[in-house]
């Protein structure tokens, strides 16, 4: 340890004869656990955690500690302003063919619950803040979900459309979305986006889940 070299030995709970080459069950478990950790460290190395937005409502758990991510996890934190989603929606920077497929799948399989505000006489400050027509909510959310995925992982389709930088992505391993309150006070929230990113399936079938934090909750 004086040379700062990590030594790691695996010992069984029971003493073995010196010529016994079998691997006890408890040692086998430790070896497999160590190997899984090694694979995880190698897989995460130099990937990124993408903060879409910043600290949510001053919540300490939503503060991305760059030193912890870089030094302990080997992940580089990156930040993307939430307005990037608005820019890509406005300019149509997403796969339009996949949008049609995703929207049709969502409308068929994702059933809405009841509207808790139905019939209420809401103040103008609230009704005025609803800038996306309720009938267009799912269109917006579908585009937002595709765009978030593209920000994290890139998309060759965008390169074909001429958006070369946007096509690259951030080589992400995980991400989070601020939302509250600068976004959700006037735009559809990211609940569906967060759920489908963390899901093991979407409109394309089975997929690997992506950890995606509500409120950019990196420290919890």
Show which residues each predicted segment covers:
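An N-terminal assembly and electron-transfer interface module characteristic of large anaerobic redox
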Residues: 1-220
């Amino acid at each position: 340890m004086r040379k700062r070299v990590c030594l790691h030995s695996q010992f069984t709970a029971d003493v073995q004869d010196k010529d016994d080459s079998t691997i006890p069950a408890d040692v086998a478990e430790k070896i497999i656990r160590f190997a899984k950790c090694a694979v995880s460290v190698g897989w995460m190395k130099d990937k990124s955690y993408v903060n879409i937005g910043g600290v949510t409502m001053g919540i300490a758990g939503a503060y991305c500690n760059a030193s912890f991510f870089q030094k302990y996890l080997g992940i580089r934190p990156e930040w993307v302003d939430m307005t990037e989603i608005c820019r890509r929606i406005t300019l149509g920077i997403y796969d339009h063919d996949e949008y049609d497929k995703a929207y049709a799948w969502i409308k068929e399989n994702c059933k809405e619950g009841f509207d808790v505000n139905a019939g209420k006489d809401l103040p103008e400050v609230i009704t005025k803040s609803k800038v996306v027509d309720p009938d267009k909510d799912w269109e917006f959310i579908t585009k937002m979900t595709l765009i978030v995925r593209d920000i994290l992982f890139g998309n060759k389709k965008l390169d074909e459309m001429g958006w070369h930088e946007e096509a690259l992505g951030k080589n992400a391993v995980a991400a989070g979305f601020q939302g509250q309150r600068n976004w959700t006070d006037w735009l559809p929230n990211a609940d569906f986006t967060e759920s489908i990113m963390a899901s093991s399936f979407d409109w394309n079938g089975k997929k690997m889940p992506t950890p995606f934090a509500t409120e950019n909750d990196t420290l919890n």
